[in-house]
A protein has these predicted regions:
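Flavin (FAD/FMN) cofactor-binding and adjacent substrate-gating region
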Residues: 1-51, 56, 62-63
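A short alpha-helix-loop-beta-strand transition element characteristic
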Residues: 1-10, 97, 184, 242-249
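Short, solvent-exposed loop/turn elements at beta->coil junctions and helix N-caps
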Residues: 13, 60-61, 190-195
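C-terminal catalytic lobe of FAD-dependent flavoproteins
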Residues: 37, 170, 176-263
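Hydrophobic residues embedded in beta-strands of well-ordered beta-sheets
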Residues: 66-69, 146-147, 214-215
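Core beta-strand elements of the Rossmann-like FAD/NAD(P) dinucleotide-binding domain
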Residues: 71-79
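Glycine-rich, N-terminal phosphate-binding loop of Rossmann-like dinucleotide-binding domains
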Residues: 84-85, 218
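Active-site substrate-recognition segment that forms the wall
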Residues: 86-209
């Protein structure tokens, strides 16, 4: 499991003096860390290439009965893993995906203001809830001294990247209520992104129904990086037909086909 420590109010304010007054305590996860997704992905690609893996840069057009066809005209044969996030239905229309839009703000450099990634205990309710829109306090100090401020969630199947000022204001006011010093900081950039969310809130991990050579890993909402290692272990065990460390059934893409038939 993951080690966590309950802390009282005295310890909480020793850890993060800039927090708003009045909190009764919190929870410290000493080994918590922040990973920058693109850098991790590039590291893994380079590591695979150093071991003989060949990297092709192309666009996948469609799955074939024994591989995948690329836009450049090449057809690759063998097992295929589809991990394309919100774009999953382009290759696998039987597995619907919803886009859950989020806003982020990055500030100028303010080293020392915040020492830990800090979030409200109710963050999980926002992340895993089914509300059309929600906000939660989630702030990260970056190695550069900048502060990354989140988080917001709203379903946006049109995938409009435009910043919503009402949602941004709502998210920031939530953050200010936990960390008042944020109100006086200069923001450098505001942007949006989209979290791929399955229709039942559980990711698709496993073999694609009706396709022996195709596998899928998608729909993790905002926990793709956090659960990446567990997802990889589960997929490898399934591919090699080994016993899995956890029950894979709740994540089996076939559950969606079964639900459709039952309906």
């Amino acid at each position: 499991g993951i080690h966590a420590e309950a802390v009282d109010d005295t310890a909480l304010y020793q850890l993060e003096p800039a927090l708003a007054p009045g909190f009764a305590g919190g929870m410290l996860v000493p080994r918590d860390a922040v990973a920058y997704g693109p850098a991790v992905a590039m590291h893994l690609v380079e590591r695979a290439q150093s071991r003989g893996t060949r990297l092709l840069r192309d666009r996948a057009l469609r799955l074939t009965r024994d591989g995948i066809e690329l836009q450049g005209g090449q057809t690759l044969r063998g097992s295929v893993l589809v991990a394309t996030g919100c774009a999953l239905p382009e290759l696998l229309p039987a597995l619907p995906m919803r886009a859950r839009k989020g806003h982020l703000v990055i500030t100028q450099r303010y080293p020392g203001l915040l020492r830990h990634q800090t979030l409200e205990l109710g963050y999980a309710d926002s992340a895993h809830g089914s509300d059309d829109s929600s906000v939660a306090f989630n702030v990260q100090p970056r190695p550069t001294g900048q502060i990354l401020i989140g988080s917001s969630r709203e379903f946006d199947d049109a995938m409009d990247p435009a910043v919503s000022m009402p949602m941004l204001r709502r998210m920031l006011e939530r953050s200010f209520s936990y960390l008042p010093a944020l109100r006086g900081l200069d923001a450098l950039r505001v942007w949006t992104g989209f979290r791929p969310t399955s229709i039942d809130g559980r990711p698709y991990i496993g073999r694609v129904p009706g396709m022996d050579h195709a596998w899928v890993a998608a729909g993790h909402e905002g926990l793709g990086i956090t659960t990446a290692l567990g997802t990889a272990h589960l997929l490898v065990d399934l591919l090699l037909e080994r016993p899995t460390a956890i029950d894979a059934a709740p994540f089996d893409p076939a559950r969606l086909a079964a639900a459709t038939v039952a309906a």
